[in-house]
Structure formats: structure tokens, C-alpha cells
Amino acid sequence: EFARVPVAFVVSRETGVRDLSQQQICDIFSGRVTNWKEVGGHDLLIDVQARPDGSNLQTIRKNLRCFAELQVTPKAHFNEHNADLVASMKTFRGAIGFMPLSEVVLHGVQAVTLDGTPATASAYPLGIGLGFVHRDELSPGTRAFLDYVETEPARDIMRKTGHVPVTK
């Protein structure tokens, strides 16, 4: 594993929220919390933007205990693709959803910290590992590329694109 792609929770800018606890996120996605003022934000109805089952949702279910068996509110809007979720974040004033941090960086949507931890931190609990699978014998070009991935210039590129380099 050379990097992680964090799965970030994103909100529309009008919510007034910049940090949520794991429990608050579960309460929001289950429908127990329905207004942003209940979690320190503005008096605005929450619009849950969910995703169909897939790697992002599996990562959340695996790493947030309260999300493991959670039934998403029936009022949720489902977005098939990241682009749909980005559009929802910009269209619906009270929206919340989740997506890879690389998409957050690419589209400039608002990510919240999770229990005070930003998605860019190595301690952030939600992420998908990235690695390489290769044959035992490497060509000189492949060896050079794998060596480059471990350098600081490559790590800078990873950070700028919403990936978190993993230190061995």
C-alpha cells in the first residue's frame, strides 16, 4: 500500500457545519437528526444524499460501528455517480453525502472533519488503500516507477490530488 483515498463526508456550504462526530453522522443518515441546528449548524432541513452499495459505503460500514447495520433514511436521495453527488452538493442547501477525497479536491465541495480529524490526516479512519500488484521480476522502468512513488515529489502530487501517502 503506497497511499489511501479517504472517504470524506461532504456538506453543502449553507449548512454552517464544519465538523461532525461519528454518532452525528449516523443519526443524520438514519433520519434521527433532520435539521442542521441539531448538530450546531443553521436552521435548515438536512437532505441526505446517499450512494448505492459500493466500495465507499462498504468502507464506511466497516469502519464506523454505528453505520454497520444502519438503515439509511427513506427520505434519502440516491446518487449513482460522484458527479451526481457533486451536483447535489451545489444544488441542495442542506445536503450531506460522502465521496472519495480525490473528488472533493477535484470539484471543490465542502468536506467536514470527522470527530475533529480532517480526511487528509493519517489518523482519519475511513479510506481505501492503493497498492501495486506486480510480478516477482521487475523491468528497470517498473522498478524506477515504484521507487519514484516513494519520493517526496510523488507524495506531494498525491496530497494535491486528495490522496494520503502511506509511510512504511
Regions found by a protein language model. Give the residues of each.
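Exported/periplasmic ABC-transporter solute-binding proteins
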Residues: 1-168
